[in-house]
Amino acid sequence: MSLMPFAPSRPLSIGVELELQLLGCNDYNLAPSAPEILRRVAKRTHPGEIKPEMTRSMIEINTSVQQEYAGLVTELRALRDVVSEAGCFLNVAVAGGGTHPFQHWSEQKIFDAPRFHYLSELYGYLAKQFTIFGQHVHIGCPGPDEALHLTHMLSRYIPHFIALSASSPFVQGHDTGFASARLNSVFSFPLSGRAPFVLRWNDFEKFFAKMTGTGVVESMKDFYWDIRPKPEFGTIEVRVCDTPLTVEIAASIACYIQAMSRYIMVEQRMAPEEDDYLVYTFNRFQACRFGLEGVFIDPRTHQQRSIREDIMEMLEHISDHARELHAVEAMERIREILIVGNGTSWQRRAYASEHNLADVMQLQAELWMGN
């Protein structure tokens, strides 16, 4: 199977996908209610898309193509409200967060769709363990070579995106010590990690042809890379974020990535180098384990600082670009996260107060649904 042509798209356009938790209101455990929710929302007019995910306790919302923060957050709120209203009718709550804190993977049910059944057969129990919840951000690119350039230049900042969105400290009733435990599950898949260091689209087409020739992959969907080109949309897709606890934070992180992309395209003159990946796995681990307090090593200068400090410096670099993109409000929310903490900090504070993970999930659902 050949690689799809890289579709035209408006540079720096944005789109967001969010995977959401469905919770029974009696115990705030995951509830296999996606089929019923989807039947109800199908009767409603709404923007974007509302889709099933791997297991029946999940649902995905996708925005349409947007240009700036105001339109993006407005559409995310509308999608949130449609799903939340359908859930309320069914006594099901909806929540953000990267993991459910006390569900057990063995209890999950695969959603009845051919691709999900295929993945379940292929990956076995990993498919049910993939009941985790992430945010994907699409950035429009002017062409395929530019998409590969942006893929590699943004890879340096993967720890920023992980640390800002981190909201998955609890797994199966325990605090893992990680800010984002969700990404440990993603790393279990054989085609996860970073994209190969290829800078020209014709070379990427050759790589893809070799991979399909082995029978290992059939399409770009089979690559679970942290950032991957999405040729059918004309975008790159950043895939490392936990689903944040509110749509406002989700939109703000997306616009942080958008403003950074504009900075890279317009102002930054560095070319990507393969040695940029020397500390990639270390920096990624630091973000997953310690969040904003993690150590960040600059791959070129070898300077060490906290991820929080690196984000603060980046906010200065991209301030003019954020202003051009009408994303000043989004950047203010990013600064607020640096001060008050990410979703993991909120969840741990809630657990310290409530001493019960079901109560934490009730509060988390109320926060997501805007109650």
From Swiss-Prot:
The keyword Nucleotide-binding applies. It holds the Pfam family GCS2. ATP-dependent carboxylate-amine ligase which exhibits weak glutamate--cysteine ligase activity. The keyword Nucleotide-binding applies. The lineage of its organism: Bacteria, Pseudomonadati, Pseudomonadota, Betaproteobacteria, Nitrosomonadales. Keywords: ATP-binding, Ligase, Nucleotide-binding. One of its GO terms (molecular function) is ATP binding. This is Putative glutamate--cysteine ligase 2. It catalyses: L-cysteine + L-glutamate + ATP = gamma-L-glutamyl-L-cysteine + ADP + phosphate + H(+). Its EC number is 6.3.2.2. Belongs to the glutamate--cysteine ligase type 2 family. YbdK subfamily. GO terms for biological process: modified amino acid biosynthetic process. It comes from the Bacteria. InterPro entries: GCL_type2/YbdK_subfam (IPR050141), GCS2 (IPR006336), Gln_synth/guanido_kin_cat_dom (IPR014746), YbdK (IPR011793). It comes from Nitrosospira multiformis (strain ATCC 25196 / NCIMB 11849 / C 71).
